[in-house]
A protein has these predicted regions:
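Residues that define the transmembrane beta-barrel architecture of outer-membrane proteins
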Residues: 27-31, 42-46, 56, 91-99, ...
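Membrane-embedded beta-strand positions of outer-membrane beta-barrel proteins
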Residues: 31-37, 60-64, 101, 121-127, ...
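Extracellular loop and loop/strand-boundary signature of outer-membrane beta-barrel proteins
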Residues: 32-36, 47, 82-92, 154-160, ...
Length: 227
């Protein structure tokens, strides 16, 4: 379905470029900073992205995304034959650094006034390449009476490497361009599993169940500057 949309958007963009717009100089390079919130997971992200536009309606992008939970004080309680344990700051098991290459297509721009402001709708397809696959952590014993002994040792979590090497994402956005500046509002559809590298994590022989959603969608805003 996405590739049908790309074909239609490409054809429309190519046919609808009027002569005046085709004659306008294309600013080939743009630096973007995007930030957003997870629509399914309780996360936020920040991404720095470089953009190259060989022609007015087609471009390629490379970004580095930093992902983090919105709350840091959450803990995961684990009950196993060895007893009760608590995994503090289990966000250490999630993906934090993600490489994000993509391509984008733009619909013909809509002139908003006589000073050059434009509204551009854009569709982007990319892959998400998590960089931190090897995660480790510790679980702490939680006695029934709530009192820990004076001396105790945390238990290491065994984590067998897992996770998909990459994930897919498609985003749609509206971009307001004024001279060299660009303001973006968009939504991303993704199959990202933020705990993908910890699906084979164990405490002893007990499998640890991290939160799992069907999708990893995000809503985002961004600002860009054309060089």
């Amino acid at each position: 379905m996405f590739f049908i949309g790309i074909a239609l958007l490409t054809t429309t963009a190519a046919l609808c470029q009027n002569k005046k717009e085709m004659d306008e100089p294309v600013r080939h390079f743009c630096v973007n900073i995007n930030a957003g919130l997870g629509a399914n997971y309780n996360t936020w992200f920040l991404e720095v992205q470089g953009e190259y536009n060989p022609i007015s309606f087609l471009g390629i992008n490379v970004g580095m995304k930093f992902l983090n939970p919105c709350t840091q004080d959450e803990s995961l309680h684990i009950v196993c034959p060895e007893g009760k344990y608590e995994l503090d700051e289990y966000s250490t098991f999630m993906y934090h650094f993600i490489l994000h290459p993509s391509i984008h297509l733009c619909a013909p721009s809509i002139k908003l006034d006589n000073v050059g402001d434009k509204l551009i709708f854009r569709m982007e397809y990319g892959i998400l390449l998590p960089l931190n696959h090897f995660t480790k952590g510790h679980a702490y014993p939680q006695p029934d009476n709530g009192q820990l002994p004076d001396s105790y040792s945390p238990i290491d979590i065994k984590n067998i490497k897992s996770g998909t090497p990459f994930y897919h994402e498609t985003s749609v956005s509206a971009n307001l361009v004024s001279d060299r500046w660009k303001l973006t509002l968009g939504y991303t559809f993704s199959n990202l599993d933020i705990y993908g590298s910890a699906r084979n994590a164990y405490l002893g022989n007990t499998h640890i169940e991290f939160e799992k959603k069907k999708r990893g969608d995000e809503v985002f805003i961004g600002i860009g500057y054309y060089l």
